[in-house]
Structures are given as C-alpha cells and as structure tokens.
Amino acid sequence: MAKNIQAIRGMNDYLPGETAIWQRIESTLKNVLGSYGYSEIRLPIVEQTPLFKRAIGEVTDVVEKEMYTFEDRNGDSLTLRPEGTAGCVRAGIEHGLLYNQEQRLWYIGPMFRHERPQKGRYRQFHQLGAEVFGLQGPDIDAELIMLTARWWRALGIAEHVSLELNSIGSLEARANYRDALVAFLEQHQETLDEDCKRRMYTNPLRVLDSKNPDVQALLNDAPALGDYLDDDSREHFAGLCKLLDAAGIAYTVNQRLVRGLDYYNRTVFEWVTNSLGSQGTVCAGGRYDGLVEQLGGRATPAVGFAMGLERLVLLVQAVNPEFIASPVVDIYLVAAGTETQSAAMTLAERLRDEMPDVKLITNHGGGNFKKQFARADKWGARIALVLGESEVANGTVVVKDLRSGEQTAVAQDSVAAHLRTLLG
C-alpha cells in the first residue's frame, strides 16, 4: 500500500471547526479596520529575493537562516514572503500609490519562515498587517495603536495584553548608540553566548533581545538607547506618549525593545501577553520612514504593524472561549420522506433569501427522524425545522428548539420572523 503523504512539518491544515473560529476573529478585525478607513491590498506570496535582502537586512536572522528561497526555471532567485511590509511597499512604488499621497492599507495571508515549529510559531503562519504611508507625525502612530486596542476590546482580551513602547531614533542616532553598545559588549565578551558574540558586530541591537539571563543581567549596566536619541525622535516619542495618555491607553516604555528587521526607525511597539508561555508577542510594529526610498521610491514617511493570527487565535481560545463558542449551524432542516425533499429545499432557499446571515443546512441522503436529529446535534444546530407530508399539505413547518426541547407548528410564510425571535 502506498505511503500516505502528510503536511510539511510546521505547515498546518485548519479543519472546518477551526476555520469557523478563524473566520469569526478575522471578521471582527476587518470590521475595525474598515471603521478607521483602511483599505485591503492583496499581494503575491512569492517575491524576488533581493526585495527582502534590501528591506529586511542581509545580516538579520530572517534573511540568513529563515527564508524559503529557490531558483525558478529562468534562474531567477525567488522567495516565499517571510513578512508583508516589503511586498506592500514594493506594490505601492510599482503602482504609484505612495508619492505625495496618504494611504491606509491592510493585508492578510500566509507568510513563511524556516523556524523550529512550536506552539504559536510555525513555518507557514498567517499575518494581518496594516501600513500607513504619507504621514509623519506621532498622531498616526497613536491611531494605529488605538486601532489595535479596539481589537482587543472587541475580542474580549484587553485585560490579557499589555503595550510596550520605545523609540530607536534616527539612523544617525542608532549608529552612535551602536558604537557605544559594541564598545560595552567588547569589554564583557566572557558573559556573551555564541549567538550574542556573532550579533555584536553584525547587528548589535539584537543583543538587547537576548533571552539569556546572564546577558540580560549584563545589559542592566549597558548604555541606554534613550540617551542617544536625536531631538526630533525624542519630541516625536513624547508626542506619541501624550496622545496615548489622553486616550487612556496604558503602556510601558521598554528601552530594550528593538525590532528584528533593519528598516525600523523612531517608534517601535509590541503588544505582549503572559497567557501564551514563551510566545508572548501578539502584535508588533513601528515606523520605517526610510524604507520606501531604500526600495527605489521617493522619500515617504511610513508606519505599520503585523499580527500573527495563530497566536491571536490561541489567545482568544485561552482567555475568552465564549467569543468563539458560536454554533457551526443555526438551523437544521429535517425532511421526512423523499416526497418532501423538494418542498424542504424550496423552503430552505426562501429562508436564505430572507435571513442571509443565518447558517442553515438541509438534510440530504435520507434517514429516519432519529438519524436526522443526530446529524443536527453533530452540526451543533440550535433549531431544527421539521417538514413532513402533513406540513407540506398545510403550508406549515414544525420549529423545535434543540436546547429547550420546545416545539411549535408555524406557518411557512411567517417562519422567518419566528426564527429571528428565537435566534435573537
């Protein structure tokens, strides 16, 4: 017998019960984005490899270790996208969306990184990202953070996430800080692990991200990034904090917070949780005012964020399971006998016209009442509609509440109104 072919490690199937959860969460996210005036952009999964090398930085873990890169039949180097910002900027430049314009965009879809799979971290994962172009003040940074805070309230997880902020300043300020940090680390190399020693010269700010407790203790005495900020970045960050204070959004300034991608400047932020173990970052972003020009466009201020949907789904399931406890099916239509099947399907179509948001399944494949009600239970239906020959003749249908067991005969012409009352 042929060996079964299974999914690639770290790339998961999401089955119908799971996709229903994803759809509800995604619908909530998209509704909030729409309320802020953001528009969807759809981007390719595969891009030219130089796009990510130029945008992310060649000495980052993503480019050095994690990208899925291959040659196509023309010999061109292509990469499965590891993140969405670079592709969004590329599309904006290519289609003339950015120069001298204000854009609020969002995208959603799979990303790919060759990492060690674990809970909340996969090789194919899904991100929702939002990017704003053409606005340089701290007010738009604040709007993005307010938008994410509204998500948490809508999903019922606001008490389980917290906001961390930092400013990493201008390119020049970071260069000065980098020199000071490297000088400090060189004096304490005996405390550094091999990964930090490698990063010390290639990307020293990433040492601040180290999870090694000895390195973290050492960093308590390291130069502080905030002491090296340029005046404009300091003023920008103060303006952001003032706006968040006015909006009642709590935050912690974390001077060790940097981003893993090279294109960020000034504001960086993360929403973190203690409810998912080691995978604590739910949403992260910041400003990247130089990236558009770096990729061949004209200088354009920009800010954005990305959120891992796998982690968000896990978090909602962990702390607010009621949000996702909606039934897969609202109504199951039981048809008693083959002679009633046509009438049942006609009634079902009429109900779908009158109640387009209701999930309704019509029984197919026959079966007695016991089997059909068992199918209704399996689907998690709240209500069963029972249509037999007498109901067809009388123009009625029996409506049974599968939770209380109560049932009543209702005229087919008025059953939609009756169902709306039962379903709330």
Swiss-Prot record:
EC number of the protein: 6.1.1.21
Matches recorded under PROSITE patterns: AA_TRNA_LIGASE_II (PS50862)
Pfam family, one: HGTP_anticodon
Keyword annotations from UniProtKB, A to Z: Aminoacyl-tRNA synthetase, ATP-binding, Cytoplasm, Ligase, Nucleotide-binding, Protein biosynthesis
GO BP, one annotated term: histidyl-tRNA aminoacylation
Gene Ontology molecular-function annotations: ATP binding; histidine-tRNA ligase activity
Gene3D superfamilies linked: Anticodon-binding domain (3.40.50.800), Bira Bifunctional Protein, Domain 2 (3.30.930.10)
Localization: Cytoplasm
Record-linked InterPro entries: aa-tRNA-synth_II, aa-tRNA-synth_II/BPL/LPL, Anticodon-bd, Anticodon-bd_dom_sf, His-tRNA-ligase, HisRS-like_core, HisRS/HisZ, HisRS_anticodon
Catalytic activity annotation: tRNA(His) + L-histidine + ATP = L-histidyl-tRNA(His) + AMP + diphosphate + H(+)
Family assignment from sequence similarity: Belongs to the class-II aminoacyl-tRNA synthetase family.
Protein name: Histidine--tRNA ligase
Organism: Salmonella arizonae (strain ATCC BAA-731 / CDC346-86 / RSK2980)
Higher taxonomy: Bacteria, Pseudomonadati, Pseudomonadota, Gammaproteobacteria, Enterobacterales
Gene name of the encoded protein: hisS
